[in-house]
Amino acid sequence: MDKLADLNYTLSVITSMNDTLHSIIEDPGMAYFPYIASVLTVLFTLHKASIPTMKIALKASKCSYKVIKYCVVTIINTLLKLAGYKEQVTTKDEIEQQMDRIVKEMRRQLEMIDKLTTREIEQIELLKRIHDNLITRPVNVIDMSMEFNQKNIKTLDEWESRKNPYEPSEVTASM
């Protein structure tokens, strides 16, 4: 464990990796060498960082699988961020939590839609009743003979003088 965290050991491993790469690739004009060296350096650093972390985590915790899974997911997400990706790796637990949250939100929205639909149906029924009350219905022909002022009307034949008493007659007035 001490050897894993020792800086001199780490530097000697990096130096030996670089020497090995230089011996494998003897062409000095190799264009991809810096990229290969960078990737190998990152992988080596992750290896050096993850092994002690995993060992400490396994000794310190009772639930080793979850800790290892969390460490691996964190390392992969860090690599993805370093590479410039916006996506992230998630564990099943996180996915299940998100799914539960989404299902709860969908249930809440369905209840809201149900309440709103019920209210809208009630409003439509109320508007229908109001409309039915406001509609003018055709009325049958009213018998005007039953009105008060026309009950005792006499016809021209029924009058004694055969003259309408309500017609204006000639009036002479003095000046």
Swiss-Prot record:
InterPro entries: Rotavirus_NSP4 (IPR002107). Residues 1-28 are lumenal. Keywords: Activation of host autophagy by virus, Calcium, Enterotoxin, Glycoprotein, Host endoplasmic reticulum, Host membrane, Host-virus interaction, Ion channel, Ion transport, Membrane, Metal-binding, Secreted, Signal-anchor, Toxin, Transmembrane, Transmembrane helix, Transport, Viral ion channel, Virulence. One of its GO terms (cellular component) is host caveola. The N-glycosyl content is primarily Man(9)GlcNAc, with a small amount of Man(8)GlcNAc. GO terms for molecular function: channel activity; metal ion binding; toxin activity. Residues 52-175 are cytoplasmic. The chain crosses the membrane at residues 29-51. Ca(2+) binds at residues 120, 123. The keyword Glycoprotein applies. It is a single-pass type III membrane protein. Signal peptide: none annotated. GO terms for biological process: monoatomic ion transmembrane transport; symbiont-mediated activation of host autophagy; viral process. It is found in: Host rough endoplasmic reticulum membrane; Host membrane, Host caveola; Secreted. Glycans are attached at residues 8, 18. Homotetramer. Interacts with the immature particle in the viroplasm. Interacts with host CAV1, early and late in infection. Interacts with host integrin ITGA1/ITGB1 heterodimer. Interacts with host integrin ITGA2/ITGB1 heterodimer. Interaction with microtubules blocks trafficking to the Golgi apparatus. Binds 1 calcium ion per tetramer. Belongs to the rotavirus NSP4 family. Plays an essential role in the virus replication cycle by acting as a viroporin. Creates a pore in the host endoplasmic reticulum and as a consequence releases Ca(2+) in the cytoplasm of infected cell. In turn, high levels of cytoplasmic calcium trigger membrane trafficking and transport of viral ER-associated proteins to viroplasms, sites of viral genome replication and immature particle assembly. The secreted form acts as an enterotoxin that causes phospholipase C-dependent elevation of the intracellular calcium concentration in host intestinal mucosa cells. Increased concentration of intracellular calcium disrupts the cytoskeleton and the tight junctions, raising the paracellular permeability. Potentiates chloride ion secretion through a calcium ion-dependent signaling pathway, inducing age-dependent diarrhea. HAMAP family: ROTA_NSP4. This is Non-structural glycoprotein 4. It comes from Rotavirus A (strain RVA/Human/United Kingdom/ST3/1975/G4P2A[6]) (RV-A).
